[in-house]
Amino acid sequence: MDVREFYGGDLQGVLDKMDYLQDLGVEVIYFNPLFVSPSNHKYDIQDYDYIDPHIGKIVSDEGDLLPDGQRENRFASRYIDRVTNKANLEASNELFAQVVAEAHRRDMRVILDGVFNHCGSFNKWMDRERIYENAEGYDKGAYVGWWGHDTLPKLNYEGSQELMDYVLHVAKKWVSPPYNVDGWRLDVAADLGHSQEFNHHFWQEFRKAVK
């Protein structure tokens, strides 16, 4: 197995196996994080607006792998094309909508994994890896990593109403047409924010947004 390749299936595979899932009596499909992310586990979100083309659909695959010995991800031009090319991103979202629609046609429900306490160091907001054109990037040492992990920047909701509004928009977006997801599983929900008071406030607003 090539360590630089992703492991596992994709959304087309789920779509192809719908008959099998229905025959098993499956009533709910719960997906681990599906959004753009450089890892296999995808709890380090890079872009909340799009399904990762590696598990969605790649229609443009230009560029090169990161050269051996090169440690700067801005030179991984094939990865950058895969996850920033609008054709790939939009095709992946469309495929996900098809998966949800087919699940609903079979009376199955679909749950997404929401990772909103932290994002990933590849995230387009901070672009630590310098893979987005014209992004401002970040000041070194200017963020706190969740549980000390520098690849998992903790989101500072108290310091940004814009951030809170955007994440609530994301939450609503995926439960609305054309995606129509049935609900969210919320990762490390109790850790979000910097106080219990704000944590409760945020999730109350989240609930209002998705109802």
What is each model feature region?
Residues 1-211:
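Active-site and adjacent substrate-binding regions of carbohydrate-active enzymes
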